[in-house]
Structures are given as C-alpha cells and as structure tokens.
Regions:
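Solvent-exposed beta-strand/loop surfaces of large extracellular or lumenal domains
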Residues: 84, 90-106
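An acidic-aromatic loop/edge-strand motif
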Residues: 1-61, 94, 108, 112-165
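Aromatic-lined ligand-binding clefts that engage carbohydrates, nucleic acids, or primary amines
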Residues: 68-92, 119-122
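Short beta-strands within extracellular/lumenal beta-sheet-rich domains
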Residues: 58-69, 104-106
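Surface-exposed coil/turn segments at beta-strand junctions on protein surfaces, enriched
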Residues: 57-59, 71-73, 82, 99-101, ...
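Residues that flank catalytic or metal-binding motifs in active/ligand-binding sites
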Residues: 20, 64, 85, 102, ...
Length: 165
C-alpha cells in the first residue's frame, strides 16, 4: 500500500547523542540594557538563576555561551527540555529559531560545521520575578532559565524520503 509521507517526519533523531559544551559563560541583560550583557559568571551546566548566587530575583534575558568541536558537519537537534520562558538558540551567530513553549527543540540543520562551533542560548522571562505587586506575593515564582534535561542528538534522514518513496 501507499505510505502517508505527511505523517512521517522528514528527519528522525538517532540515538547518537553528541557532546554539549563542558563549560558555559552565563551573562545577563535586563530589558533596558539588552543586547548589552553584563555580570558574567562561569557555569558547568545550563541552569536557572536560582542556582546563581545573587541572581535569584533577576528578570530579563540570560545568555549561555559555549563551544563544541565537531569532527564533521552534522545535522542535529538540540532539545532544551524544560525552559522558563522564551528561548532562542544561535549556532555560529545564526539563529536556529525562537520557542515560546514546549517542545523547546531546535533543528540545527546546516548550522553545525566541522571544527569549532559557538553555541549561544538566550532565555527571556517576564518581570514577575523582579516586580512583586501585593497579589503576586502569594503566587509561586517560576524558575528562570533552563532546567533541562538538555540533549544534542544527531539526525538521520528518513530513508523513505531519501529514496523518493
């Protein structure tokens, strides 16, 4: 019988997981200073501001910067897992897109090259963590940043589409 190609994804994530940067530089910009980032701190993982001393009440944009080396150009998907709230991913200065809600997945086709690759992730939240009115004092403050789990998986093209079937 005929196969419904519209129901098949063009690319399927393989089980091959690629390495993420081992170290990240985290910086912050509020709505007035963006795109100028300040207050740089190092981090071993992508995280939420609640894990950075003194940053607990920040509202604005967090920038995570790291680099990874590739032996060859690859087609991969970056899945950020849980993010609070808006995420944009850049690879080598090119935006891979913006996500406002789950799933926080980014197709990195044609972005990861052989050699060194600069990864930049910007996460923006609303002013709720910084400005507290009388009613919001009783509401739970959501985290700000990336809770994960974060994965980078190599893609393999759907063989049926590749063969034109």
């Amino acid at each position: 019988g005929e196969k419904n190609m519209a129901a098949e994804p063009l690319y399927k994530a393989s089980e091959e997981t690629l390495n993420l940067p081992e170290k990240w530089a985290v910086s912050f910009a509020d709505s007035l200073s963006y795109p100028e980032f300040k207050e740089n701190v190092p981090a071993d993982t992508l995280c939420c501001v609640q894990e950075i001393s003194g940053w607990e009440k920040k509202a604005g944009t967090l920038r995570f910067e790291g680099s990874i080396r590739m032996d060859e150009a690859v087609h991969a998907e970056l899945d950020l897992g849980e993010v609070f709230e808006i995420a944009e991913v850049f690879v080598n200065g090119i935006s891979a897109g913006v996500r406002l809600c789950k799933p926080y997945r980014f197709d990195l086709k044609d972005l990861l090259v052989q050699g060194e690759n600069q990864i930049k992730i910007e996460v923006t939240n609303c002013l709720g963590t910084a400005l507290r009115d009388p009613i919001s004092h009783y509401l739970m403050i959501e985290p700000f940043g990336i809770e994960g789990p974060v994965t980078l998986k190599k893609h393999s093209q759907n063989s049926d589409l590749e063969a034109g079937r």
